[in-house]
């Protein structure tokens, strides 16, 4: 029988992790897969092991003189990444998670701007890190690798050293008292480094967000979560902490192409992802259903089960067992965030018995602002605002649409060394998100687009590019698209809604094997013009790739 979680409010991550280590001591916190040729080994790290390794590694960081300093973490999602990041948080070392995909110039610039004195990194980044080390442009004194490599400190040597120091009586790291209000994480927003902003977050804000999430979403200590979202993103790292606060086991994927295999291999029950991942899961399964000629049957059974559900008869997981098995067999809960999810996809998951909710948040809000839950789901919305937050719509238009602004403990401290940009978005304690939306009579929040992307036509009509992009992306022939406003050549006071489309070469060749390049473009344009769009579109620029 599944045991309901006990939700406790903490104001820092250290107390939260100590509570979890005590409550879920022998539960598995992380499982790591080690491949050696054809042989595969699974290493389980319990909650007790995790806290021990954090304290051992953190103690070594203190012995290196990093107390009160800053340390970067860069690499793929793994147990070592989690330990390095959490060791920073529990010891008052500002953690700077960085994107492993940055070019060397961008990575070096981020390291300089964040003023880190240590970096913990993945072996795959060895050449880049070595070049940065040799350049001498950063303040980094300690280069620590997850793997044993010449010229770098070894992660597990530091764990061994820290263990010995603690056994010899060293307790400075373990006894450190976290300041919940101080900057604890420095996160760069997405975009090129020259334009990205370094967001300062504190532990009280993150811990409050975790508490709010646990109050409205249901997690069990028997759940298994797969860490697809990169930990250097706030959505990924806070998601990791939500799982640790709930006693959940986290496993790591082998890559997007192995998603279905991994879901089955680990018996994954909870999946937190962005729409592109969730769309991929949906489309893969539905293509197989179509191939088997079962599309009409599935659609009929969805209508039937939804009707029975209104009578409080739930047959979904029995009737759609084959579809659920294609998602590993144990999937029960999916959380989507980071971008709008196609309404069809969300309805499909819920219709087959997998609870899917959408959330909305930003790096600057640690991150979740609102989310759907078991009892609060409304099509097209991103749920109800989190309990610790005040959310309102600023400068509403006639339709009640305006900028979403937020106030509460999980709002950032500001942008690091950028008072001007901080003052642009933080006014009287309210964070101005730059997102447009509205709150309906029931308190549900709806996102309509980005303020800076909004296209306003001469006749006053407002066009939200994101809505059109979702619609166009539904076409099988379309791989991706981009909607934007283009000045009207005939009227300088007006704009035209323009579209750029990348077509799916595999699909188009399969459906239209004898079509020329121009004929394919004509076919796609015809498909787009038949969409239910109440605005005139310029004929799109259609190509194979952006």
Where are these regions (language model features)?
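Structural core segment of the AMP-binding/adenylate-forming
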Residues: 16-17, 90-161, 495, 505
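Conserved pre-ATP/AMP-binding loop-to-beta segment of ANL
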Residues: 25-28, 163-188, 195, 218-224
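Conserved AMP-binding/adenylate-forming core of the ANL superfamily
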Residues: 26-78, 82-86, 103-108, 163, ...
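ANL superfamily adenylate-forming
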Residues: 36-39, 127-179, 285-322
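Conserved AMP-binding A3 loop
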Residues: 43-48, 184-210
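AMP-binding/adenylate-forming catalytic core of the ANL superfamily
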Residues: 119-121, 408, 413-414, 436-535
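Conserved AMP-binding/adenylation subdomain of ANL enzymes
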Residues: 207-224, 231-320, 330, 355
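Conserved AMP-binding/adenylate-forming
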Residues: 271, 315, 319-445, 451-454, ...
């Amino acid at each position: 029988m599944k045991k309901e979680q006990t939700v406790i409010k903490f104001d820092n991550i250290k107390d939260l992790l100590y509570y979890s280590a005590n409550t879920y001591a022998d539960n598995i916190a992380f499982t790591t897969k080690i491949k050696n040729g054809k042989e595969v080994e699974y290493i389980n790290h319990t909650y007790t092991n995790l806290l021990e390794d954090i304290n051992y590694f953190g103690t070594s960081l203190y012995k290196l003189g990093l107390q009160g300093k800053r340390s970067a973490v860069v690499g793929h999602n793994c147990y070592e990444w989690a330990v390095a990041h959490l060791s920073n948080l529990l010891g008052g070392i500002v953690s700077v998670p960085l994107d492993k995909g940055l070019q060397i110039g961008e990575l070096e610039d981020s390291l300089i701007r964040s003023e880190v004195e240590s970096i913990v990194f993945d072996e795959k980044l060895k050449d880049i890190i070595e070049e940065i080390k040799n350049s001498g442009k950063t303040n980094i004194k300690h280069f620590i690798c997850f793997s044993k490599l010449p010229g770098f400190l070894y992660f597990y040597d530091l764990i061994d050293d820290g263990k010995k120091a603690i056994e010899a009586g060293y307790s400075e790291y373990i006894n450190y008292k976290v300041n919940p209000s101080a900057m604890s994480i420095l996160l760069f927003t997405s975009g090129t480094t020259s334009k990205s902003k370094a967001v300062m977050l504190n532990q009280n804000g993150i811990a409050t967000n975790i508490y709010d999430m646990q109050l409205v979403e249901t997690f069990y200590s028997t759940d298994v979560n797969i860490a697809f979202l990169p930990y250097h993103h706030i959505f990924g790292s806070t998601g990791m902490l939500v799982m640790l606060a709930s006693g959940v086991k986290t496993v790591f994927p082998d890559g997007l192409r192995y998603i279905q295999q991994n879901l089955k291999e680990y018996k994954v029950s909870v999946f937190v992802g962005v729409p592109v991942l969730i769309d991929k899961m949906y489309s893969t399964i539905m293509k197989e259903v179509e191939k088997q000629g079962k599309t009409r049957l599935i659609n009929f059974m969805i209508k039937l089960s939804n009707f029975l559900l209104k009578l409080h008869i739930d047959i979904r997981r029995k009737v759609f067992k084959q579809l659920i098995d294609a998602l590993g067999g144990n999937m029960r809960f999916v959380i989507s965030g980071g971008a709008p999810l196609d309404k069809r996809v969300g309805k499909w998951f819920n219709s087959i018995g997998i609870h899917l909710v959408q959330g909305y948040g930003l790096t600057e809000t640690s991150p979740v602002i609102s989310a759907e839950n078991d009892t609060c789901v409304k099509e097209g919305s991103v749920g109800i605002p989190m309990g610790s937050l005040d959310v309102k719509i600023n400068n509403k238009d006639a339709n009640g649409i305006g900028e979403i602004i937020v106030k509460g403990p999980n709002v950032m401290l500001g942008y690091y060394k950028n008072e001007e940009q901080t003052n642009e978005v933080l006014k009287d304690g309210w964070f101005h998100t730059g997102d447009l939306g509205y709150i309906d009579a029931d308190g549900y929040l709806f996102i309509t687009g980005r303020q800076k992307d909004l296209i306003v036509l001469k006749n006053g009509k407002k066009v939200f590019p994101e809505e059109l992009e979702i619609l166009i992306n539904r076409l099988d022939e379309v791989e991706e698209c981009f909607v934007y406003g283009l000045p009207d050549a005939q009227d300088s006071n007006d704009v035209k809604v323009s579209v750029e489309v990348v077509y799916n070469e595999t699909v188009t060749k399969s459906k239209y094997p004898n079509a020329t390049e121009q004929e394919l473009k004509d076919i796609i344009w015809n498909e787009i013009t038949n969409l239910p769009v109440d605005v005139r579109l310029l004929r799109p620029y259609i190509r194979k790739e952006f």
